[in-house]
């Protein structure tokens, strides 16, 4: 798992 996968990233 990675933080980028966990955090909601805006497009």
From Swiss-Prot:
It is found in: Secreted. One of its GO terms (cellular component) is extracellular region. Its main location: secreted. GO terms for biological process: defense response. Keywords: Amphibian defense peptide, Pyrrolidone carboxylic acid, Secreted. Expressed by the parotoid glands. The modification Pyrrolidone carboxylic acid is found at residue 1. This is Bradykinin-potentiating peptide Pb. It comes from Phyllomedusa burmeisteri (Brazilian common walking leaf frog).
């Amino acid at each position: 798992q990675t933080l980028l996968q966990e955090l909601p990233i805006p497009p």
